[in-house]
Amino acid sequence: MRILYLLLSVLFVVLQGVAGQPFIPRPIDTCRLRNGICFPGICRRPYYWIGTCNNGIGSCCARGWRS
């Protein structure tokens, strides 16, 4: 009977992959939500700094000038 539970769990994992859903959900990318791009280091022209990236190393930069 234990083998049935193992087969059922493997079946669910396979079906979840087929459905296109990630097995481990990714964290929300806040930089992309703010229409930004992650750059290593600092932002250069024509981009300006709007925050930090999820990895903590890069800068979240947006194109254009602040108004």
Swiss-Prot record:
Q: Which residues form the propeptide?
A: 20-25
Record's signal peptide: 1-19
All disulfide bonds of the chain are 31-60, 38-53, 43-61
Cell membrane as a keyword of this entry, yes or no, is no
Compartments where located = Secreted; Cytoplasmic granule
Q: Which GO terms describe its molecular function?
A: CCR6 chemokine receptor binding; chemoattractant activity
Q: Does the keyword Lyase apply?
A: no
Q: What does this protein do?
A: Has bactericidal activity.
Q: What's this protein's family per the entry?
A: Belongs to the beta-defensin family.
Return the protein name.
Gallinacin-7
Give the originating organism: Gallus gallus
